[in-house]
């Protein structure tokens, strides 16, 4: 059995307001955990209670991240196929959305492993519904290109397609580059385009601002650097 376990979107005291009790029950019964890093996996486990003498330190953690090649994923899957209760967790939010877990789940499906997902916070879905830009048609673009010329070209292409297809585009950036990306969006998008910045979702510092670009150019901009943010546009 492979459990897809939701994680928090940031540091909060307690988790009952975000994660359902079914996640507590699933985690308390785990035999193994797959995580992006030992530190993040152990931090996740530490939030939950286990029946004594078992503690969060007793759960073995196996790494699955951008450095895990196909051979290593298959070797990990060989262990999952043998049985026990395995959990898969992302550093934050739902696994398999913009993280390496998606390819592993496909492998698990191909080999007949039973997979169960649990409800939890997703910055993609939360930003979409909070933005007000509509959820009928949308595309998650993921991370933007690192090279500025390519990035601006991609932004203009998304804006054009959004207007043509009447859909919303969602995308993200490495948090320390958020302010620079917001500046580029305001400079290069057309003034009638809708732009949303959804920041620190589910946290006490949550901020969601949706305005046309022409209004963004006039207001005081929020400080977004090092704060997890999802950007959305609708042409």
Label for each model-derived stretch:
Residues 3, 103-161:
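Class I SAM-dependent methyltransferase SAM-binding "motif I" and its flanking Rossmann-like core
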Residues 65, 70-115:
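Glycine/small-residue-rich loop that forms an oxyanion/phosphate-binding "nest" at active or ligand-binding sites
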Residues 39-41, 93, 123, 177:
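Alpha-helix capping/helix-boundary segments
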Residues 62-69, 144-148:
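Conserved helicase motor
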Residues 1-64:
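Glycine-rich, flexible N-terminal cofactor/catalytic loop recognition
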């Amino acid at each position: 059995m492979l459990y897809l376990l939701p994680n928090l979107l940031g540091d909060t005291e307690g988790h009952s307001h975000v994660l359902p009790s079914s996640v507590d029950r699933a985690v308390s019964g785990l035999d193994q955990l797959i995580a992006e890093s030992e530190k993040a996996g152990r931090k996740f486990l530490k939030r939950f209670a286990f029946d004594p003498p078992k503690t969060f330190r007793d759960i073995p953690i196996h790494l699955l991240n951008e450095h895990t090649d196909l051979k290593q994923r298959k070797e990990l899957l060989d262990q999952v196929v043998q049985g026990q209760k395995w959990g898969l967790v992302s550093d934050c939010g739902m696994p398999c959305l913009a993280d390496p877990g998606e390819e592993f789940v496909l492998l698990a499906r191909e080999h007949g492993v039973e997979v169960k997902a649990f409800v939890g916070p997703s910055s993609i879905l939360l930003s979409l519904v909070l933005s007000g830009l509509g959820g009928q048609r949308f595309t998650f673009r993921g991370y933007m290109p690192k090279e500025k010329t390519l990035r601006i070209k991609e932004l203009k292409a998304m804006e054009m397609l959004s207007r043509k297809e009447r859909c919303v585009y969602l995308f993200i950036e490495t948090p320390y580059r958020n302010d620079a990306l917001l500046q580029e969006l305001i400079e290069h998008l057309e003034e009638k385009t809708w732009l949303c910045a959804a920041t620190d979702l589910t946290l006490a510092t949550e901020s969601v601002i949706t305005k046309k670009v022409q209004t963004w150019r006039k207001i005081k901009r929020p400080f977004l650097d090092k704060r997890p943010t999802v950007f959305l546009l609708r042409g």
